[in-house]
Amino acid sequence: MGGMSWIHWVIVIAVVALLFGGRGKLSGIMGDAAKGIKAFKDGLKDDSSDEVSANKATGALPRTEAEKEDLRKS
């Protein structure tokens, strides 16, 4: 509990290497992470817009008999 085992030192060295090594700046790493998140969100947005356009195309026709009866009553 008082001392650090070898696995703790490996983790500490990995974190230090990530922060100060690698690309040289933490901001560069965070910038890359932000670009990845933005690309992921854009991909989700593109998928949802495709679904919306598909729903609009099929949404013009009633899908069930109950919807057809509702339209007839109106």
From Swiss-Prot:
Q: Name the segments for region: Disordered.
A: 43-74
Q: Which UniProt keywords apply?
A: Cell inner membrane, Cell membrane, Membrane, Protein transport, Translocation, Transmembrane, Transmembrane helix, Transport
Subcellular localization is given as:
Cell inner membrane
Q: What one GO molecular function would you report for this record? A: protein transmembrane transporter activity
Q: Does the keyword ATP-binding apply?
A: no
Q: Which family does it belong to?
A: Belongs to the TatA/E family.
Give the protein's recorded name.
Sec-independent protein translocase protein TatA
Q: Which organism is it from?
A: Caulobacter sp. (strain K31)
Q: What taxonomic classification does the UniProt entry list for its organism?
A: Bacteria, Pseudomonadati, Pseudomonadota, Alphaproteobacteria, Caulobacterales
List the gene name.
Answer: tatA
